[in-house]
Amino acid sequence: MSTSMTKEIQEKELTMLLYFKEFCDKHNLRFYLCGGGLIGAIRHNGFIPWDDDLDLFMPRPDYEKLAELWPKYADTERYTYCRTDRHHIYHDAGASIRDNNTTFINRHSMHEDICHGLALEIMPIDGCAPGKISRALQLMWAMTFALFNAQRLPDNKGPMYRALAGCIYKVFSSQSVRYHIWRFAEKQMTKYDFNTSKECTELIGSLKGMKLRHPQEDFASVVYKDFEGHQIPVMKGYERYLRLIWGDYMQLPPVEQRVAKHDAAFADLHTPYKKYRGIYYAQNKAQP
């Protein structure tokens, strides 16, 4: 991906972020920068120069409220709330807000008839199970959820998990069966309330992230950091979180690793994705 394209993506995502922040402030929803966006805020006061996406965390209660409030009160002509359900498969276990006036088709979902606008990715933070057995069960259900919800061979959980996933998909090929499995798994893994748990955890994402436990106070409140000239919330315990995930997060990675991570099959930031239905995505579908 070219530097100019990356810069344009960042400009679009900043606009989306500011709208999202305005919406969350209005409806008293908590969120924080995470991933590259968090490192960018702390190390660069904005985007990492080569980063082509923006990820957010929300406590599970706020994450679920967002799903209810967005369709009612947001500008849905402009931005769509997206999340895998019985009828739409995004091949991503989290949620997203997508810009309807853009096109950004990820290779892993190019066959799906879904919203293919540029995305602001959102992942929940959940209450962590307190005991060893309950925690092991929570992780088991989290991996089951990820497997059947995302419905693609994982590239961030190791080769053994990837091989096992391929076998399981062959056995459970029915979309209806997969849906009921991940819905049940989701209920089991999220039964520990975020607000009353002593620790919290990421149940969506990499296997490394799933295994980590964070003090609840690190995520209970926010501090604001400069991000491209705007004050954006990050979790109060961002330093401990970043050290745990990345170690020396202020150290720049080797030059060869400073590349955009998304594998886009096609991108056009000036044209609504629906214009490309049947051409660059859902090619077995006729245009309306």
Question: Locations of the language-model features?
Answer:
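Conserved catalytic core of two-metal-ion nucleotidyltransferases
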Residues: 2-27, 70-130, 149-246, 252-288
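Short, His- and charge-rich active-site/binding loops that engage polyanionic ligands
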Residues: 140-141
